[in-house]
Amino acid sequence: MAKFQPRIADDGRDDGLKEKMIQVNRVTKVVKGGRTMSFAALTVVGDGDGRVGMGKGKAKEVPVAVTKAMDAARRDMVKVSLKNGTVHHNVTGEHGAAKVLLAPAAPGTGIIAGGPMRAVFEVMGVTDIVAKSLGSSNPYNMVRATFNALRRSTTPSEVASKRGKSVEEIFN
């Protein structure tokens, strides 16, 4: 199995998005006539300002699989509200047996996250965060759990509107 090798891909597009390949896996389909080899790629793209997407692509050749994954990631982007380069509050996310814990960090802390989570935060524009992964270390499940956690994060104004209060009342 291919290990986590972050790198920024450049396929000639000029849409201002950062791209990172998380994993490329050689997969095999066994048929009556023998084995059919193909490649599966897992990638993330982000604009560096809170928008991030993940994609998976399969093809007979690695570059085609990576291109398909990048296109899929561009189509499935989510917007996450950031505060000074970090998340607003502690949040957890799960996918399968993977569980991730995300916590805001003080400026200058950096990205303290392992494996595929780091790539997600780098392309998203997060500069300071503490993240811990529990359970499965499968890169796909870890990225999906990270996305689930990011989707669950809320801004103070969202919390205030749900409670029918002002933002100042929430902090006091």
Swiss-Prot record:
Function: With S4 and S12 plays an important role in translational accuracy. Located at the back of the 30S subunit body where it stabilizes the conformation of the head with respect to the body.
Keywords assigned: Ribonucleoprotein, Ribosomal protein, RNA-binding, rRNA-binding
Transmembrane segments: none
Family: Belongs to the universal ribosomal protein uS5 family.
UniProt source species: Methylibium petroleiphilum (strain ATCC BAA-1232 / LMG 22953 / PM1)
Ranges of residues in domain S5 DRBM: 17-80
GO molecular function, one term: rRNA binding
Coiled-coil ranges from the UniProt annotation: none
GO BP of this protein: translation
A GO cellular component entry from the record: small ribosomal subunit
InterPro entries found in the cross-reference section: Ribosomal_Su5_D2-typ_SF, Ribosomal_uS5, Ribosomal_uS5_bac-type, Ribosomal_uS5_C, Ribosomal_uS5_N, Ribosomal_uS5_N_CS, Ribsml_uS5_D2-typ_fold_subgr
Record text about domains: The N-terminal domain interacts with the head of the 30S subunit; the C-terminal domain interacts with the body and contacts protein S4. The interaction surface between S4 and S5 is involved in control of translational fidelity.
Quaternary structure note: Part of the 30S ribosomal subunit. Contacts proteins S4 and S8.
Alphabetized Pfam families for the sequence: Ribosomal_S5, Ribosomal_S5_C
Name assigned to this protein: Small ribosomal subunit protein uS5
Keyword Acetylation: no
